[in-house]
A protein has these predicted regions:
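Long, basic/Gly/Ser/Thr-rich N-terminal segments
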Residues: 1-157, 450-451, 555-557
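Glycine-rich, often acidic-flanked micro-motifs
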Residues: 2-45, 178-194, 208-557
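A short, charged
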Residues: 121-129, 175, 465-469
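Ampiphathic alpha-helical segments that act as solvent-exposed interaction surfaces
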Residues: 146-165, 528-543
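Short capping loops/turns at secondary-structure boundaries
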Residues: 149, 153, 175, 192-196
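N-terminal pre-Walker A segment at the start of P-loop NTPase domains
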Residues: 154-178, 183
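Conserved lysine of the Walker
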Residues: 199
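Post-Walker A alpha-helix
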Residues: 202-203
Length: 557
């Protein structure tokens, strides 16, 4: 490997493959030709007459052509009660798909709930398809996803979550969040953040505290609940007033706000465990506040292998798992990251865990450095990690229908120019952050969620027009957003649910840049101090708080 190259991937044995074996690490290591989002990606298939039919025809034509010559896998899974069917001829995608999600049998065994009779979402993920580009397509009208000639699991997972999320919002008022969640002393904290701001670090870091349980690493389902007069917590999925007006899914919250006196309005609701109830509006105790509950989505977490940089002890299980796109590293990379690798190795050598000690005791520091360097070199290298093998089973939410009560929502950012460390957000500020969705590289992801199955261009055009109006008038962006007609339905869904989230939780802004504090020695101390800020905030749920780089010490010391 040339000295100026930091890492590289083994070449494909033939130019037509979309996946092949990488240099050994973990249980397996699959290299995918596409290692990120496909250049061609279309979430507005329904806007082009005949396109969906052509895509389905192409998929079935390819399946017929390879019938009997290559394995084709069809596997149904359950994602928060929604049944999803994937059809693929990719060994890698099938392998990760069945590991990632609950099968129908696993869902029923774990939750005690029977799966639906038929899938609501259909997925085709096929490689070797002649006449098709490396591309991804989504039809909202038919809940159909088609991926051609790409084996990168990350995009497949994200688009499936997005498609399921649209169903849950429209039909059930359930909010799908690209975020991570941890419980501490019975209170849940939900982190919402773009990549590169410390979401995983903040999640795993909080696990060093007592009375904590790990909930979610990447995706969370949130239900906003009312209390009934007999003490049950329910979320309303449909309502019909005595005046004939109706609402369903995400629309029910505002409808109830506007019809509080319609005591005989009929409601269809569900309990936290999915028991269906028929109620009237007078059965709800509307004097009680809304409460948010979060549910996990994945059976086994698909996460970045560079987790070992901040949490070295995770290396044991990551190296005992299936990998995707873990590269080889050069001597230049090892030299450039020597200090970081020395710290990781030091922690691994000091670990008292018996299995971990056995795995690493026979390896030299040079071998360990190379292994760990491979895990942290490429930002999109992934592992399929069973978190119950990293943490004790009683410290993990393993049942997808066991909720955690959310107390705090934390929007993470990493802005070196902003002296703010922690701030309790107003509704306008909370919504503006999510509408603009600025990432560390100055791009924009609405709701910090690139997974959403929406017309991104139409949404961004609507938001940017409102931003210009806000700049010219001085009116807060969210107020203009709320007042203007013509917003895409997907934006209406998303931000109505965020409005309800603000009512049901305490919402904060956290800037993960304590390394710029001259009193902080290194990154590890910065992470430790950030964890103390989060832990105290979750314990106390302070209102109106504003901490800066100059005064936050009194909060954590």
């Amino acid at each position: 490997m040339p000295d100026d190259v930091l890492y590289s991937f083994p070449s494909s044995p033939t130019p037509d493959l979309s996946e092949w074996a990488g240099s050994p690490v973990g249980v397996s290591n699959t290299i995918t030709r596409t290692k990120g989002r496909t250049t061609v990606h279309n979430k507005t298939v329904d806007g082009t007459p005949g396109l969906l039919e052509r895509l389905i025809s192409s998929a079935h034509g390819h399946l017929n052509a390879i019938d009997g010559r290559h394995p084709v896998y069809q596997h149904d899974v359950m994602i928060h009660g929604i049944r999803v069917r994937a059809t693929t001829n990719s060994d890698h995608l099938f392998d990760f798909w069945k590991d990632n999600w609950f099968s129908l049998r696993e869902w029923q065994r774990t939750t005690g709930q029977a799966p639906p009779g038929e899938p609501s979402v259909h997925v085709y993920a096929l490689h070797g398809v002649k006449g098709e580009q490396v591309a991804a397509y989504y039809s909202h009208d038919t809940n159909t996803i088609a991926f051609f000639n790409t084996s990168y699991y990350g995009q497949l997972k994200s688009w499936v979550l997005g498609a399921v999320g649209r169903i849950l919002a429209a039909e059930y008022g359930i909010h799908s969040i690209h975020g991570a969640c941890v419980e501490k002393s019975g209170k849940g904290v939900l982190y919402i953040a773009p990549t590169g701001t410390g979401k995983s670090t903040s999640s795993y870091g909080l696990m060093d505290y007592p009375k904590t349980r790990f909930h979610s690493d990447d995706w969370v389902y949130v239900r906003y609940t009312y209390q009934t007069r007999d003490g049950r917590r329910v979320f309303v999925i449909r309502v019909e007033g005595t005046d004939g007006t109706k609402a369903r899914g995400y629309q029910v919250y505002r409808w109830i706000e506007g019809h509080k006196n319609d005591a005989k309005a009929r409601l269809r609701a569900m309990t936290l465990s999915n028991q269906v109830l028929d109620l009237t509006l007078e059965d709800l105790d509307l004097a009680r506040p809304l409460v948010a509950y979060a549910y996990t989505s994945e059976k086994v977490f698909y996460l970045r292998t560079n987790l070992v940089e901040n949490f070295p002890l995770s290396a044991h299980q990551i190296l005992s798992s299936k990998e995707e796109n873990v590269p080889n590293v050069s001597s230049a990379f090892l030299a450039q990251h020597g200090k970081t690798l020395d710290g990781v190795i030091r922690d691994l050598r000091a670990a008292r865990d018996g299995e971990l000690h056995r795995m690493f005791s026979l390896k030299s520091d040079t071998e360990l450095a190379d292994l760990c360097a491979r895990l942290i070199a490429f930002d999109n290298a992934r592992s399929m990690l069973d978190i119950t093998k990293v943490l004790p089973a009683d410290r993990v939410f393993a049942n997808p229908m066991e909720p955690v009560k959310l107390a705090a929502v934390v929007l993470l950012k990493r802005s070196a120019d902003d002296p703010t460390v922690l701030e309790h957000l107003s509704l306008d500020d909370f919504m503006e952050r999510l509408l603009i969705g600025e990432t560390p590289d100055k791009k924009h992801e609405t709701a910090y969620n690139a997974y959403r199955a929406v017309d991104d261009k139409a949404e961004r055009a609507f938001i940017e027009t409102r931003q210009k109006e806000a700049l010219a008038s001085g009116t807060p962006l969210y107020q203009l957003f709320s007042q203007r007609d013509g917003k895409p339905v997907s934006l209406d869904e998303e931000f109505e649910l965020f409005r309800v989230m603000y009512q049901a939780t305490h919402c904060y802004d956290l800037n993960t840049t304590l390394q710029k504090d001259p009193r902080v020695r290194d990154k590890r101390e910065a992470v430790s101090r950030t964890m103390r800020v989060i832990a105290r905030t979750l314990d106390e749920e302070p209102k109106g708080i504003h901490l800066s780089i100059d005064n936050y010490n009194s909060y954590v010391d």
